[in-house]
Amino acid sequence: MFTPVEAKKSNLITVGRITGVFGIKGWVKLKSFTDPQDNVLEYSPLLLKTKHGVKECEIAEYQFRPQGLVVRLKGVDDRNAAEALAPVDVAIDKSLLPELDDDDFYWHQLEGLRVVTIYEGNTQDLGVVSKVMATGANDVLEVKPDAQSIDDRDRLVPYVLDLYVKKVDLSAECITVDWDPEF
């Protein structure tokens, strides 16, 4: 049914999640984490991160339903086979992602970077980006403290280039912000 692939965790990016089954003919509900949501359909092969390892698969058919995106994977032809898949994360190899402009970054590139503020000329370590959230107005960095940070507070820093985010240096694994550490 699926081809096992060698898992190189650092090369896999989660782009969605199979959340349940739809109907009796092997269709599954696919929650896409891409923006726009239908971008998940552009990637092939998809990699299912199962408890038995990473399995390669391809989408045979898809439909947009009121309940969301539903797909039928090649080799999954009945409800029993579909039930064996849910819930499972759906990933792709990083190499499938398109190149971005110099000042654009994928969220996974920002996660794990150290955040340093230069607020009022004082350089202080705020912690590490644990995740990035979409809020509608702008993305927000969730910064968690660690042994190097100035205190043990969690912080939410708006990802607004030039205003708050002054520099993202992937090679130095650091984001420089101008953010009041009291917030």
From Swiss-Prot:
Single biological process term from Gene Ontology: ribosomal small subunit biogenesis
InterPro entries per the UniProt record, alphabetical: PRC_barrel-like_sf (IPR011033), PRC_RimM (IPR056792), RimM (IPR011961), RimM_N (IPR002676), RimM_N_sf (IPR036976), Transl_B-barrel_sf (IPR009000)
Keywords assigned: Chaperone, Cytoplasm, Ribosome biogenesis, rRNA processing
Major place of residence: cytoplasm
Compartments reported by the entry: Cytoplasm
A Pfam entry, by short name: PRC_RimM
GO molecular function annotations of the record: ribosome binding
Annotated Gene Ontology cellular component terms: cytoplasm; ribosome
Cystine residue pairs: none
Domain PRC barrel: residue ranges: 102-183
Gene3D superfamilies, per database record: PRC-barrel domain (2.30.30.240), RimM (2.40.30.60)
Subunit structure: Binds ribosomal protein uS19.
Record family assignment: Belongs to the RimM family.
Free-text domain note: The PRC barrel domain binds ribosomal protein uS19.
Primary role: An accessory protein needed during the final step in the assembly of 30S ribosomal subunit, possibly for assembly of the head region. Essential for efficient processing of 16S rRNA. May be needed both before and after RbfA during the maturation of 16S rRNA. It has affinity for free ribosomal 30S subunits but not for 70S ribosomes.
This protein's name: Ribosome maturation factor RimM
Organism (species): Saccharophagus degradans (strain 2-40 / ATCC 43961 / DSM 17024)
